[in-house]
Every structure is written in C-alpha cells, then in structure tokens.
C-alpha cells in the first residue's frame, strides 16, 4: 500500500541526491530506498543519519553493486534489508533470482514464510531425513524462493566476482578514453 516518492539523483554518481531526501519526507514516509547504481555507493552516512532522525527504515537496493564498498565496508551492512539481484544483466547471474541480506531475525523469519507462498516449511525441510513433516499456511505469500539449479549457478558465479569486476573497470576506462575527446559527453 505504499506510495513511492522519488528524489532526484546526483549528476556525479547517478545515485539518489542525499541533500534532497529530507524535503521529500512526509508524515507517511516509512523508508528510504537508496539505489547503489553501477557499482557506486550512495552517501550512506548521510542517509542513515536522516533515517535515524526521522525513525525510518533504510532498504538498500544493491542490484548493481555486489562488490561495491562504502568506506571500506561491503554494501549490505548498513540498511536492513539489502536486496541484490542476480538477473542476467547484473554483476553475476543465476538467470533469475536474487538475495536479501539482513540483521533482524524476526524480519528474516517473516520473509522466509512470505517467499514460499506463506507456507511455514520449504520442501527440503518437509521431505528431509526425518520424513514428511506437516506445514502450515501462515499468510498469503509470494514465490520468491530461488530454484536449486539457479543457486548452483550463482555459487559458481561467485568464484568469478573479482574477475568480472576487473573486466568492467577495464571496459569503463576504455569508454572513458574513447569519449574523452567529445566535449558534449561527460564520463565519471
């Protein structure tokens, strides 16, 4: 039932302009969702301070920032939760799917139930070594769980994260060099 309120981006990073966030906050605001775009981290110290001052959640969108760091700390350690995407055009791929990281056991348990159509136990637990166990439908839910084959692809892709990152940096520098002589184009 939430209504998104958009905040403009910074020209130098293409990320949310943290200086404009407070003007967009209303009594109905529940969360700030910074998007770390193209491997560039948002100004998280400022965003977290604004969130604390207004008692808001911070949900980090790190779909394009798997290897990104903010002040030498991996993205995903500040907001709660942080969402990563592993779609085909992301930093690594599983074909479909993604990952949430969070530091809140209550929220993690709730999200685990929601990801399986509101069912209390997944198939591995229902049909594991101990045999069939009963499950309950706790609430309406969604189909957010990743298939095992996609997870296996992701585990293999994780081994290549550093190499993929170095290749993207190399290609970005080639674009910078190619566009350097065109005054109408600005790269960063």
Language model: regions and residue ranges:
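Hydrophobic residues in beta-strands of the RecA-like P-loop NTPase core, especially within AAA+ ATPase
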Residues: 35, 59-60
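Conserved active-site segment immediately N-terminal to the catalytic lysine
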Residues: 60-94, 133-138
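Glycine-/small-residue-rich active-site loops that bind phosphorylated ligands and cofactors
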Residues: 12-13, 39, 90
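Structured binding elements
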Residues: 1
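Short, Asp-centered acidic motifs that coordinate Mg2+ and/or phosphate
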Residues: 30-31, 57, 81
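PLP-dependent aminotransferase class I/II
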Residues: 8, 19, 23, 31-35, ...
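Short beta-strand-to-turn element immediately C-terminal to the catalytic PLP-Schiff-base lysine
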Residues: 84-85, 98-103, 155
